[in-house]
Amino acid sequence: LEAVESSLTNGVSCITGGAGTGKTTVLRTVLKAYAALGYEIHAVALSGRAAMRLHESIGFFTMTIARMLREEPISPSLVQPKHLLVIDESSMIDLPTMYRIVTHLDPSVRIILTGDPNQLPPIGCGKVLSDIIESGAVANVELNIVKRQEGSTGIPEYSATINRGDVPPSLSFGAITFHETPPERVVDKCKTLYAESAHNTQIIGATKALVGELNLECQRLINPGGQRLEF
């Protein structure tokens, strides 16, 4: 309720929180209210896939930030005087991109930023969402209670615990299984697990050397007589 009220009463506001905390549900409610008040909704995301997911979640037309910037600036008119811009996954937006966005808008356009400041930072310079939140100059409501649903993997709860600096009560939880393995056995363990479902497995390593060794061992396991491609 606080997040909905904040988004409706402030010209610029943020709705933040980790996965599974209900950002999409809150945003859907806010946008329905704005639409009922006569606002034209402009919803954008950084990538095409993210824009598609946003459309599926909120039911309003969405586009990429790049496409929005190629179109005419968003400004009031006699036909449509009220506009709202929603920027999803805004933790991924760097400073130059945000500058281009705000200069593409009339000052009367309302803005809602959504995202998780604890996710990966932007590739370019500037951590816009984190800086906005830390400044306290823009209204922000953080959703910090994971709404676990039936069939949940448990990953949001697990990551939220780690984000708080706490050790999860159980290292294996939900769909997460922790294999206690000595360093010299990590590659063998990964190879064994990979063999169980090679086409549905992604292995992530901490170093390039480890990734190289894992790739080599998995290739030997799945395609022992294969030839390396030369470029």
Where are these regions (language model features)?
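Residue-level marker for buried hydrophobic side chains located in beta-strands
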Residues: 85, 111-113
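Helix N-cap/beta->alpha junction signal
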Residues: 47, 94, 205-208
